Amino acid sequence: GITPMKKILNRFGLGKLVYLFVALKQLLFLNPSQVSVNMDGNSETWSKVYFIAVMNQKYEGGGFKFCPNASSSDGMLDVIVVEGLSKLKVLFCLPTAFFGRHTRFRGIHIYQCRDISVESAVPLAIHKDGESGGIHTTFSVSMEPEQIQMIVPDSK
């Protein structure tokens, strides 16, 4: 659903700012945690992960260009891992994500894979296309080889 804050901001044409406010709120209260990731059989563990996003589009909530080279047609998942940074540095990097310029900062990693499984030391909030997926310590995402067939009416 739409939050009361988003409704107010929508009246002024600023609805996308709600995502920035949510990100700032999460950053203030979030403690980074140890996370282990397996991507296509390759494992990596980080001790101070702020968040991981698995995407097949460039943009996420409010226009953040977290995975600037993501494509829905390449058959790959694009993954961003933000880890090992101070909260101040994450705060500094966040606005650059609107333009996809955050990838140059140390502690921000971009990967491509077909399958990913994530295991966290503490339960984390999971979001699926902007909707809550609950609180979990593990999750997996796979890119399926089939594409959705679309039926589009003739334009007359």
Language-model-detected regions and their locations in the chain:
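Long C-terminal subdomains/extensions of small-metabolite kinases
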Residues: G1-K156
